[in-house]
């Protein structure tokens, strides 16, 4: 996988099964965020291939993700402070517009608006946040904004959900909430996550890909990867 003529990732083959949670882990600078950004359409990929349900696709731009059944959250959360929680979630259903997200999602009327609101409420229920639908997002504590951001990603009913550091900045109790949310979401979609909290990774992931220096050095089920000497060496800074 190349960017700007430079090879950023080498020999990375990632596969994802239905209703599976796959974690991308590795030390700082390993390449996991680069891979996540490529999947999220945040960088221009010059080489490499993408296949969904056996069909090849060009590497997507952000506005093309929903059309491929992909949705994502990012570390920065990015809620609109002037909107209510429900309105923020409705904005996540952006199938056509490249810009004007708010006007395209909130300018609906009649049946279309009712259907979108219902999907948004369902998404909030899945992250245990339906009770705050009418609150302004700028009134929320940080852990709750993380859940609302996930709900916004769910409103388009994705088949693949990309989560960037879902437990980042959370305390122990909120991490338990997040673990529960992710496990429940996997019953309806497949999930790829980047996460530094290893207790989260061990709790929710079915399989792991461990990256170091832009390459996958280990992959497989959690316990198998956990005991791999190459993984231990990477995290301890030991050269094999």
Predicted regions mapped to residue ranges:
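Glycine-rich phosphate-binding loops of nucleotide-dependent enzymes
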Residues: 1-240
